[in-house]
From Swiss-Prot:
Component of the eukaryotic translation initiation factor 3 (eIF-3) complex. Pfam families: eIF3a_PCI_TPR-like, PCI. It is found in: Cytoplasm. The lineage of its organism: Eukaryota, Metazoa, Ecdysozoa, Arthropoda, Hexapoda. The gene is eIF3-S10. Keywords: Coiled coil, Cytoplasm, Initiation factor, Protein biosynthesis, RNA-binding. Residues 900-910 have a biased composition (Low complexity). This is Eukaryotic translation initiation factor 3 subunit A.
Length: 1124
């Protein structure tokens, strides 16, 4: 493509030369360069550019280049839309005319292609038959698709481009609407429904765009009356085209647009326009199945014609009134349950839709059938209509004659059908349906039950299924109680007396109320009669009340007369002031609008003048620049033509765009050409080497490997295919033979039975006919008898049902009272059980706490007793080591710990605990009894050193007197006196606890009470303590007073020394260099080292371990800890 921009006349001359030699595409490119130039020469006049533009568009039409034509049209519009609008209009109209002519020629050519048939005797050639079977089209359709459709598409694109080109330009507004109407005619002519929808959407989008406020003065403004009128006329053409194409949705949208434009206009539309609007609107409503709004539109048309049309004739008035009357009578009766429609509608509620439709008709509220009939009476439509249709109104809305209703209506329908050109034929089916509904409603007021054949006889123009459908719709929409008995072929009306859902009185003739309606309104009627009776008994009461109210009103008027008079005067004054203010504001607003319009016109003229001056200056400047640029480009063109002679130069130029070429000089272009040539040569050599190696190795290896595999695969596949075919063929032959034999045998067997079947069927048919007639007669007689019997039984049954219902209610009341008493008793028992369980729990908790307290006291006594024994032994040893001549030791005084001297043990060695020996309790390891049969230790807290002399009456026991050891639940005194007063021990109650068998006094083998099986202690710890007690035992076992071995030697008493700090009281191993402060009371004064102590035994699992107790530190800081 040449980079040199030619002058328009030169380009046109060169294009004609290309056309002469048959190169139309080159001619179009030459003309396109003129319009594609970025430095456009605006100083050229339309006389020079217009011929170029016509030739350019002619070539675009010839080559079907609609997008290229669009580009040129946009450039031409930018040049002449403000300078010479006539030239732009001529160009666009010429372009569309050329496209339409070529489309018509293509249509004629397509029609001629189907006529030119070589052989008239053989119209359906094999090729045409195959094509129709493949694509489902005939020859004409295929011809249109190949010849006509491309030109139709081109014409459609041309219309769309022109509309987009002129949509916002106020100077071309008339041309825009003319093209829109041409597009409507195009859609009608070629039946392009989809394109018509797109065109409507495009026009609606353009209207929305011009409705927006625009700051540009040349744009279209919707506030202008001319613009509104043009848009209104275009929408009326759109509505007419949509109705002709039967696109009712687009017609409805067009009606909405028309109504919006009429509302936007300040002027009242012309009566002719409104008449056309109402006519089209009535047609759209009828096609949509909305008879109510169809009749409303016809009524509005009648009112408009009567008020605005001056020379209307009587025949025309009669025709219009008759049309309105028939359309109103054809409206279906209103539904008693319009709220049911809400469950069917999906997008908007019926009320909103009805309000929108009423808004299109200029109504304040939605119309109804009753309101339209009242409006007909008010406007004297009935008297102006034809006599036969006035009689139709009397039959359907006034008279009550169900037996002759359908006959009378059928006569009127026959008159309508007799005229084939009558416009009332479309209402015949709707009138029949309304008549059937009226018939059913009137029949229901006369009969309670009617036979279905009789009802069909009354409904002359309805068959069985249609009448059944009418009955179902009456129940669904008109709230009628109807039951169809298919077995008895009858219809029941108003059988449910307890149900009445419709409160408003149905319109139309009514003879009497239904029984359910009478039952429902019984109280209302009683109230009316009672009020009448009161008025008859006391007639002066209401009169006196009226006199009193009249006197009160006169008194209030006399008091407020002056005030009301002044208020009315003030109101009149305010109204006058308000009117004057509104008039003044309107005058000021009109003056302001007039001033603004004049200012706007002046500013537009001034802006237009400035724009023209600026454009002239810009043209002069660009003309000089273009001349210099053309000289430079001429030189560059010569250099580029030289480079184009080589292949490398052509590739280089393809890589560079126009901007880069314009920036480079000839030397730079030559350097780039050499560089590109070198790169291309190196790349080509590398590619050749790489491809040579790759192809050589790959092909050679592939063929060597695939040869044996392919041969083996082919051999195996041939063998398999042959075996498979043989098996399938043998199986198919066997199956076909077997099926053939079976079919022949079955055919022979059935042929023999055919005559017998015919004879038997005829004989059976004759016999059953007589039997059926006799049985039918008997059935009817039995049916009548059964009906009478069931009526009598129903009376007895209902009486019995009422009695049984009363008895059932009594029985249910008795059961309910018994059930309440039972529940109250169960609730009282439950409360009592909970109270007893709570008492037991509290008692068990007290017993447990008392046992723990006594155990702690016993351990404290045991510890102190052992300390005293050790002190006594040490004192005896010191006395033995002293010399005989020394002074005698003073006799130790009696104390509450030791008792009198006479109470000393006879065998102290037997009671003295062993030293430096760890003695197990026998609970977790072998004790003294198990190892050698020795007697267990006597130093438990139950038995002191003097316990073997308890029977002797000694008073020196280790027990403390008073209430120190007494628990709140002890059964007897814990302390016993000496001598004879001690008596039997009574402290062996269920709440005392002790050790094992070794804890019994010497010489007695009686085990302790708490070691017996099933004792209260074991029972308490195993049965009464649940899961919530395990946490308490676990916390007791985790105390800080369990000794260094963590309770591994239960039954022993450990001594904890004084702690240097808080950390010394912790259990577990001590750090190196620190002394262990824990000691066993059975060890001697010099305990073994930590490493010489015996190995700890593993603690066996035991749940019934009582909690330990800490008796507190002694005078040396040591604390005894008893482990169980």
């Amino acid at each position: 493509m040449s980079r040199y921009v030619q002058r328009p006349e030169n380009a046109l001359k060169r294009a004609n030369e290309f056309i002469d030699v048959g190169k139309k595409a080159r001619a179009l490119d030459t003309l396109q360069e003129v319009f594609r130039a970025k430095k456009w020469n605006y100083n050229w006049s339309e006389s020079i550019i217009e011929p170029v533009m016509f030739k350019y568009l002619d070539l675009c039409v010839e080559l079907k280049k609609s997008h290229i034509a669009k580009e040129g049209l946009f450039q031409y519009r930018n040049m002449f839309q403000l300078v010479n609008v006539g030239s732009l209009e001529n160009v666009i109209r010429g372009y569309l005319k050329m496209a339409e002519e070529r489309t018509e020629q293509a249509q004629q050519q397509s029609s001629q292609a189907t006529v030119d048939i070589d052989d008239l005797d053989n119209l359906a050639t094999p090729e045409s038959i195959l094509m129709s079977a493949v694509c489902g089209e005939d020859a004409q359709d295929r011809s249109d698709r190949t010849i006509l459709l491309p030109w139709v598409k081109f014409l459609w694109e041309s219309y769309c481009q022109c509309l987009e080109l002129l949509k916002v330009n106020s100077h071309c507004e008339t041309l825009y609407h003319d093209i829109a109407r041409m597009a409507f005619q195009f859609c009608l002519k070629y039946n392009r429904k989809m394109e018509f929808r797109k065109l409507c959407e495009k026009l609606r989008k353009h209207l929305e765009d011009i409705c927006k406020v625009s700051s540009q003065t040349a744009n279209v403004t919707i506030s202008k009356p001319e613009t509104q009128q043009l848009n209104l006329e275009t929408r009326l053409h759109q509505l007419d085209s949509a109705i002709q194409m039967e696109l009712w949705l687009e017609a409805y949208k067009a009606i909405e647009d028309i109504h919006g434009l009429m509302q936007l206009s300040k002027k009242t539309p012309l009566p002719k326009t409104m008449a056309l609007y109402y006519t089209k609107l009535a047609m759209v409503f009828w096609k949509a199945g909305n008879q109510l709004f169809h009749a409303s539109a016809l009524l509005k048309l009648f009112q408009l014609s009567r008020d605005m049309k001056k020379n209307v004739t009587a025949e025309e008035i009669q025709r219009m009134t008759t049309h309105v009357l028939i359309a109103t009578l054809a409206i279906p009766l209103p539904s008693a349950h319009p709220e049911f429609d809400r469950f069917i509608e999906t997008d908007k509620s019926p009320m909103e839709k009805a309000q929108r439709l009423a808004f299109l008709l200029g109504l304040q509220q939605s119309p109804s059938r009753a309101l339209l009939l009242k409006e007909l009476i008010r406007l004297n439509v009935l008297q102006l209509a034809a006599p036969q249709f006035r009689h139709l109104y009397q039959l359907l809305e006034v008279e009550f004659d169900p037996l002759n209703l359908c006959d009378q209506v059928q006569k009127i329908v026959d008159e309508i059908e007799a005229d084939p050109n009558s416009v009332y034929g479309q209402y015949i089916q709707a009138l029949k349906d309304v008549t059937l509904v009226r018939l059913v409603r009137q029949i229901s007021q006369v009969y309670q039950t009617i036979e279905f054949p009789r009802l069909l006889e009354l409904a002359k123009f309805a068959d069985y299924h249609h009448l059944e459908r009418i009955l179902v719709d009456c129940v669904r929409h008109n709230d009628m109680q109807i039951t169809i008995d298919h077995r008895n072929e009858c219809v029941h009306f108003g059988t449910d007396l307890s149900e009445s859902q419709r409160e408003d009185h149905p319109d139309g003739p009514t003879l009497q109320s239904m029984p359910s309606e009478q039952i429902r309104s019984q109280l209302v009627n009683m109230s009316v009669v009672l009020h009448r009776a009161i008025a008859t008994i006391n007639p002066n009461r209401k009169k006196a009340e009226r006199e009193r109210l009249r006197a009160q009103m006169v008194h209030q008027y006399e008091e407020n007369a002056d005030k009301e008079h002044q208020r009315i005067l003030q109101r009149q004054k305010k109204i006058e002031d308000r009117k004057e203010y509104i008039e003044r504001m309107n005058q000021e607003r009109e003056e302001e609008e007039l001033r603004l319009q004049e200012e706007q016109v002046r500013m537009q003229k001034l802006a237009e003048q400035r724009r023209l001056e600026a454009e002239n200056e810009e043209r002069e400047r660009k003309r000089h620049e273009n001349e210099l640029q053309m000289m430079k480009e001429r030189n560059m063109k010569e250099k580029i033509e030289q480079i184009k002679q080589t292949a490398t130069g052509q590739k280089l130029l393809k890589k560079l765009d126009e901007e880069e070429i314009r920036k480079l000089n000839t030397e730079e272009i030559a350097a780039r050409e050499a560089e590109e040539r070198l790169k291309e040569r190196k790349a080509h050599e590398n590619n050749l080497k790489t491809q040579e190696k790759k192809i050589d190795y790959f092909e050679r290896a592939k063929r060597l490997e695939e040869i044996p595999l392919i041969e083996k695969y082919l051999q195996d596949r041939s063998v398999q295919d042959k075996e498979f075919w043989e098996k399938q063929e043998a199986a198919r032959i066997e199956a076909a033979i077997a099926e053939r034999k079976n079919a022949e045998a079955c055919q022979e067997r059935l042929k023999r039975m055919l005559p017998d079947r015919d004879v038997y069927w005829q004989q059976l048919k004759n016999e059953r006919g007589n039997q059926f007639a006799e049985k039918l007669k008997q059935f009817n007689q039995a049916l009548e008898e059964e009906r009478k019997r069931r009526l009598a039984d129903r009376v007895v049954k209902r009486r019995e049902e009422r009695r049984m219902k009363w008895l059932k209610e009594k029985e249910e009341e008795r059961r309910r009272i018994e059930e309440e008493l039972r529940k109250q008793k169960e609730e009282a028992d439950r409360i009592e059980r909970e109270r007893r369980a709570e008492e037991r729990r509290i008692q068990d908790e007290k017993n447990r706490q008392l046992a723990e307290k006594q155990l702690a006291i016993a351990e404290e006594v045991e510890r102190r007793r052992r300390e005293e024994l050790e002190q006594m032994k040490e004192a005896d040893g010191r006395r033995e080591r002293r010399p005989a001549a020394g002074p005698a030791e003073p006799k130790p005084e009696e104390s509450w710990r030791k008792g009198p001297a006479a109470a000393a043990p006879a065998n102290p060695a037997a009671d003295e605990p062993k030293k430096n020996v760890w003695q197990g309790s026998g609970r977790y390891g072998p004790g003294p009894r198990e190892r050698g049969g020795e007697t267990g230790p006597k130093d438990k807290w139950r038995t002191g050193p003097e316990d073997h002399e308890k029977d002797g009456g000694g008073a020196g026991g280790m027990r403390r007197g008073g209430d120190m050891r007494r628990g709140q639940d002890d059964r007897g005194p814990i302390r016993r006196g000496g001598g004879e007063e001690r008596g039997e021990r009574e402290d062996r109650g269920p709440i005392r606890r002790g050790g094992g068998p070794g804890d019994a006094p010497a010489g007695t083998g009686t085990p302790r009470r708490d070691d017996r099986p099933g004792g209260w202690f074991n029972r308490d710890r195993r049965d009464d303590r649940r899961d919530d007690r395990r946490d308490d035992r676990r916390d007791d076992r985790r105390g800080d007073d369990r000794g260094p071995r963590g309770g591994g030697e239960r039954g022993n008493t450990w001594r904890r020394g004084p702690a240097d700090n808080a950390d010394d009281n912790r259990r577990g191993p001590r750090d190196e260099g620190r002394q262990d402060t824990w000691r066993n009371t059975r060890q001697d004064a010099a305990p073994k080292q930590k490493e010489d102590r015996p190995q700890r035994e593993a603690r066996p699992a035991q749940e019934n371990v009582p909690p330990r107790s800490n008796a507190g530190p002694d005078e040396e800081g040591w604390t005894d800890v008893k482990h169980r």
